[in-house]
C-alpha cells in the first residue's frame, strides 16, 4: 500500500509540473496567429492565418 501511494504521489507531481510549467503544451510546437501573421508579412505576403497547426500565407493583391 505504501508503494502504491508513493507511485501515485510521483505521478501526481509530474502531472502538475507538466500542466503548469510554460512551454509544455501541445501548442508550443504549432503556430499561433501572431507569429504566423508576422512571419508571413516578413516574407512579403499580405497576411497569414494558422490552419491545422501550420501557417497559411496569403499573397498580396
From Swiss-Prot:
Signal peptide span: 1-19
A GO CC annotation given for this chain: extracellular region
SUPFAM superfamilies documented for this protein: Scorpion toxin-like (SSF57095)
Nucleotidyltransferase in keyword set: no
Localization (cell): Secreted
Main subcellular localisation: secreted
GO molecular function: ion channel inhibitor activity; toxin activity
Species of the source: Lychas mucronatus
Keywords carried by this UniProt record: Disulfide bond, Ion channel impairing toxin, Neurotoxin, Secreted, Signal, Toxin
Residue pairs linked by disulfide bridges in the UniProt entry: 31-50, 36-55, 40-57
UniProt-listed Pfam families: Toxin_2 (PF00451)
Name of the molecule in the record: Putative neurotoxin-A
Family, similarity comment: Belongs to the short scorpion toxin superfamily.
Tissue and organ expression note: Expressed by the venom gland.
Amino acid at each position: 500500500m505504501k508503494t502504491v501511494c508513493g507511485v501515485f504521489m510521483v505521478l501526481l507531481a509530474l502531472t502538475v509540473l507538466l500542466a503548469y510549467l510554460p512551454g509544455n503544451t501541445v501548442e508550443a510546437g504549432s503556430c499561433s496567429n501572431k507569429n504566423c501573421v508576422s512571419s508571413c508579412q516578413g516574407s512579403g505576403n499580405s497576411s497569414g492565418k494558422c490552419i491545422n497547426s501550420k501557417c497559411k500565407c496569403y499573397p498580396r493583391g
